[in-house]
Amino acid sequence: MSFAGSADSGFVVPLGTDSSVGGDNDGSRPMELIVIGLAGCTAMDVISILQKKRQEITSFEVRVHADRAADHPKVITRAVIEYVVTGQNVDEAAVLRAIELSAARYCPAQAMFAKVFPMELTYSLYEVGQSAPAKQGAYVPAAGGAA
C-alpha cells in the first residue's frame, strides 16, 4: 500500500507503510510527515531570525521527538522540539528570542499543535569544533502562551 501526495507547490511526496499492515515500506508514514512539517516550520523561522540577527551559524538542526498514544488512533500526546545550533560566538539570548518568536508568532504548525498536545522546546549551543554544548536550556512560554 503506497500513495503519492502533492499540494499547491507541486512537489510529490511518497507515502507508504510497513509490511506488517500491508505496505511495501516504500515511503514516509503520514504521521512522520506531520512531525517533519512541525520541525521544518519552526526551523525556517528560527534560522531566518538568527540570520537577520547576524548570528554566525555553521550548522543548524531541529529534532522533534513525539510521543504517541498506545491505542488507536495513536495520536501525538506530547512533543519535544530540540534546536541544535553550532556557530561562532552565537548569542544565547538571540537563539532564545528566535525560538520564542517562532513558537508565539510565526510558526502555524506550532500554534496549531500547541492547542492539541504539550510541547517542550529545548536548545543546545555548540561552538565550532566542540563536541560538548557550550550552553543548553529551554524556552518556557509565559502562562497561557503558545507552545
Region spans (language model):
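Extended beta-strand/beta-hairpin segments
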Residues: M1-I36, I47-A147
